[in-house]
Amino acid sequence: MKVLFAASEGVPFVKTGGLADVIGSLPRHLKSQGFDVRVILPKYSDIPICFREQMLKLTDFMVPLGWRNLYCGIEKLKYDGIIFYFIDNEFYFKRQGLYGFEDDAERFAFFDRAILEVLPRIDFQPNIIHCHDWHTGMISTFLKSHYRNNPFYQDIRTVFTIHNLQYQGVFPRTILQNVLGLGNEYFGLDGLEFYGQVSFMKGGVNYSDILTTVSETYAEEIQLPQYGEQLDGLLRHQKRKLHGILNGIDIDIYNPDTDPHICVNFSRETVDKKHINKESLQKILCLPMRPDVPVFGMVSRLVSQKGLELIGSVLDDILALDVQLVVLGSGEKHYEDMFRSASRRYPDKVSVNIMFGNTLAHRIYAGSDIYLMPSAFEPCGLSQMIALRYGSIPIVRETGGLRDTIQPYNEYTGEGNGFSFTHFNAQDFLYTLKRTISFYRQRNIWSIIVSNAMQCDFSWYKSAQKYQDLYKKLLFNGDR
């Protein structure tokens, strides 16, 4: 079976979020099961030069977009056994950053149209194009509108994965004809129309053969007004083709037993060595080296989705306790300022690192005792799975993938791998945090919780098998 992954970012080339991790991992696992899997991305100037220098140009051609024909080059690079293709157009992709430009509608409409145009030119006819998030939402639309009578494309099926419904790619109606080259028949409730504008996300939802999202709970949540981002009615209507499949993590990269980024390697059997990583983390971040104090870790975008409103409401209450807090990430300025202010007021308790550093991220997972993730919503979440692997016990809100991966500790049965609370309420969060600390102080119980956490399997194996089953069902049973 031939599968083409189409996405706007992917590890190791460019990354702004969890989507890139999926693109860097899932294709490899499918390939190991005998699939011919390839990936196609924009050729951003942000891609490190060490990769750009290895790319081989295959061809170039003109892509029709609205009333124009635009240059497109296609380049190829094999990495970790996977063939990656890169769509090249310097006007659209030679910029600092990936998203947030005024012409994003044009940029990603071009990308989606170029993907379809390039396939016969590289002699690759996939059975399935697996599209990811709004940036690739027009691929299934274009297949229906521009390519349905072309024999090359008639048997291609599409899967569209929603990684985060909050980002929908909504643009003025004028792009319908000027950029997309579509008639008014595509501007309706069963098409691209979204409150008088054009939604790329709706293109993916309405015109793809199968919809997936990145956890079972999130697939249920987005059909509700609270989480549906004004598309809940449409998603309820399309629920027959909607499937929730939990993301996995790359257990080779996130393996405390072999991780080159951390001070001392350890495993579930040698978890006593974890304390050395804690001491190292405290030392490099200039925190008092106290083995008895619980270290809370956060590696996160600093945005409202991550529950920072809750943390801000009770931050002084938390820091009045005998704890340390380590934060790594960047995002909205008022949250950055909130943590900076806390580090000035509590210099012996708080280390704030407004940036992203991969090595420091690994060291926080390895050196922290408790991992904070009280998200307002979380489609899947990878950080809590990584934290479990390193024996850092998550405190989460029961939403999306957090609900699917964290089993609250039961002191009567000894089961559970973390702690959770249900309502988006600061006092509930604070109560859960204090309860977690009380178990941390009971070292025998804490050892059981850490052991439970580190034996969890969130590799891609089970998730990749579910995607395989979905692909086969789509192709061989004709279910759409």
From Swiss-Prot:
- State the Gene Ontology terms under molecular function: alpha-1,4-glucan glucosyltransferase (ADP-glucose donor) activity; alpha-1,4-glucan glucosyltransferase (UDP-glucose donor) activity
What InterPro entries does the entry give?
A: Glyco_trans_1 (IPR001296), GS/SS (IPR011835), Starch_synth_cat_dom (IPR013534)
What reaction gets catalysed by this protein? [(1->4)-alpha-D-glucosyl](n) + ADP-alpha-D-glucose = [(1->4)-alpha-D-glucosyl](n+1) + ADP + H(+)
Q: Which residues bind ADP-alpha-D-glucose?
A: K15
Q: Where are the transmembrane segments?
A: none
Sorted keywords for this record are: Glycogen biosynthesis, Glycosyltransferase, Transferase
Instruction: Give the source's domain of life in one word.
Output: Bacteria
Q: Name one Pfam family in it.
A: Glycos_transf_1
Pathway listed for it is: Glycan biosynthesis; glycogen biosynthesis
What EC number(s) does its UniProt record assign?
2.4.1.21
- CDD domains named among the record's database cross-references: GT5_Glycogen_synthase_DULL1-like (cd03791)
Q: Name one GO biological process term.
A: glycogen biosynthetic process
Family recorded in the similarity comment: Belongs to the glycosyltransferase 1 family. Bacterial/plant glycogen synthase subfamily.
Q: What role does this protein play? A: Synthesizes alpha-1,4-glucan chains using ADP-glucose.
Protein's name according to its UniProt entry: Glycogen synthase
